[in-house]
Curated annotation (Swiss-Prot):
Keywords, ordered alphabetically: ANK repeat, Repeat
Domain Death: 379-467
Presence of the UniProt keyword Repeat in the record: yes
GO biological process: signal transduction
UniProt KW Transcription regulation keyword: no
Protein name per the record: Ankyrin repeat and death domain-containing protein 1A
CDD domains in UniProt: Death (cd01670)
S-S pairs: none
Pfam families noted in UniProt: Ank_2, Ank_4
SUPFAM superfamilies: Ankyrin repeat (SSF48403), DEATH domain (SSF47986)
Gene that specifies this protein: ANKDD1A
Amino acid sequence: RGCGTAGCRRTWRGRPTAVGRVALHWAAGAGHEQAVRLLLEHEAAVDEEDAFGMNALLLSAWFGHLRILQILVNSGAKIHCKSKDGLTLLHCAAQKGHVPVLAFIMEDLEDVALDHVDKLGRTAFHRAAEHGQLDALDFLVGSGCDHSVKDKEGNTALHLAAGRGHMAVLQRLVDIGLDLEEQNAEGLTALHAAAGGTHPHCVRLLLRAGSTVNALTQKNLSCLHYAALSGSEDVSRVLIHAGGCTNVADHGASPLHLAVMHNFPALVQLLINSDSDLNAMDNRQQTPLHLAAEHAWQDIAEMLLIAGVDLNLRDKQGKTALAVAARSNHVSLVDMIIKADRFYKWEKDHLSCRDLSDPSGKSLSFKQDHRQETQQLRSVLWRLASRHLQPREWKKLAYSWDFTEAHVYAIEQQWTGTRSYQEHGHRMLLIWLHGVSTAGENPSKALFEGLVTIGRRDLAELAVASVGAYI
């Protein structure tokens, strides 16, 4: 029923939703031709925008409803409209891959700018590449669009396709001849973008096409850095196989630093196996082990310790990794580092217990011992520390077993109350047990000799009697 009053027109317009959508928007977006015609007959505002600046014409292009688009154009809709993000009809159709709509826009509408940019500085060509719309991209190329244009961040279509992992589009762009080494405003190449986006297939494609594997950004970050930041083992493996450098020379964070910092254990192991510099220092003079100690990453710390990291290196504050762990009260890590330090000092003076002929090397661990075969002895050591050793005696015993001042100081940083010395002594004894077990020594004999050395023969005889069954 026709009505020309303002109130009736408001009824046909419909009440706007929270995002400013009215009836014509919904009808155009859904492709309801009859509803669109009816609304237009009742004087619905053809160019009315929603909260995002999208009108019925833009929505029909976005959803690919060519017939609706034609109806709206014939009803006087403004064809040079754009959303608040700067999206034109061409942007909308290209991003969603609607080639028939693109063809109508280019062939039937007047004065359409093929390379018009949105608020990000991106053309329809950028949008098609970024969203993996190969057919739309081919249409735009055939229409003569600018291939090399950059957005406001300096990205080419190659950057955008690589970063999103669109293989088919990426291959087409490579075939077209886009510059593989073109850098964006931060110095990233398309290979950086593919690596950071964790797209190993795109990384392989670009490397085969001739991308430089060790290209650096303005912050001296390689593609392997970006793979490490995202924790991608697959991308890292591809880059390393292609000659990607695992180290840096300017005291920046290495890929290993980044993998440790973000707690990617499997990637850390891959980088260790790929001859990464375990002792590389970042701009705080921290090694990867310093970072593991700071964040209490036990699994990663063990990998680094087993790999043979230098435990004597100090950061800008003059702290070793042991001191960092102690300061942060990461008790388990403190004990692991002390075990490793004592092990490597023992190893230096003896045949390597990690020799291929020696199976003990295959199970080397510095973590807390939970083995069934040592349970009885560990119980004896706990009773010794908690019931029999006097407050200062654990330290005398530690020094007799070649614990260093740094070791003892690190253990003492833990505070559990006035009887903290009991826990300190227990931890020291467990660290000692790790050493004698690794060395293949008789723990009963070594414990007896140690207690006698500090003047506690009575306790030595008691302890040996307690562990007799274990021996």
